Amino acid sequence: MTSEILRNEECNPNLLKKKGLELLDAGKTNEAVECFSKGLVYAPFDSLMRFWRGRKLIGREEYTQSASDLKLAALENPEDWECWYYLGVACYLGGMYEEAKVAHANSKTLMKKYGVNALPATTDWYWMICMKLGQPEEAAKALEDITPDMPTEDGDYLCRVLLYKGVLKPENFVEECEKNCKKQSRC
């Protein structure tokens, strides 16, 4: 449907955004990225198109371009924890550790503010960043508010953080992670 309308309104950024989201739903990531890119020609400050293009560029290992898009999306929408989270991921994977650290600190603050059950995920990335930067004390401090029974959307991140914290041991990590995950109904 959107494709038919776009033939008549090929410069309409809202239709290009809608088409890009439809393409993502259909698993056509490359086509979606191109659609968002075209939409950004007509609406360069559309934070949603920037976010989705930036997020999907991570999967293409285009970390610098991804970080560029996600940074602008985060600045346009500073209360969106996901923009900061994926900016941190892109920066980490692109070797921009200081920027990644700031992004994950912002993500964590916003997750707490809005009650998002994803603290272990951003804490995991933050811990890895601190370790890369040679800041083990700060990495350890980041783990303080993570507990085995905390609600989370992704039990794998929680298990990794509990491993860093010493709650789970490397010798039986997989078994303990599965047990913890089932106990919390997160698998």
PLM features: what roles do these ranges have?
Residues 8, 42, 76, 110-114, ...:
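Structural marker of alpha-solenoid helical repeat scaffolds
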Residues 2, 36, 63, 70-71, ...:
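Hydrophobic/aromatic packing residues within the alpha-helices of TPR/SEL1-like helical repeat arrays
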Residues 21, 55, 89, 128-131:
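Residue-level recognition of tetratricopeptide repeat
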Residues 5, 38-39, 72-73, 106-107, ...:
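Canonical positions in the second alpha-helix
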